[in-house]
Amino acid sequence: MMTAARTAPKGKGIDIIETAIVTGEEIQQLSDTLKAMFEEFGMKFFLRDADNILQAECILLIGTREQAQGLNCGHCGYATCSGRSEGVPCALNSIDVGIAIGSACATAADLRVDT
């Protein structure tokens, strides 16, 4: 699944995808973090997921580094990449991570790996 995410198509062919595996005691730490996020933000899915992940042998995390792709496409809401406010993600980064997750999920389905 990590390989599928890593090799998925990317905007401009630039790989800024990050993957990691969480195992062992780190799963409990992640669960504790999700519970703290529930306390801070009040969103119940954090609490649900905090309990659900304790059943897993491992957890695959997929994300992206934030890096403007220099296309000045405007999909982020700004006319140019240089005009983008700090903290506003490049839309291509979001698209890339979505494609990477889709590729990883397709591999999971092929292997009959469920949630």
Regions found by a protein language model. Name each.
Residues 1-115:
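Acidic, surface-exposed loops and disordered segments
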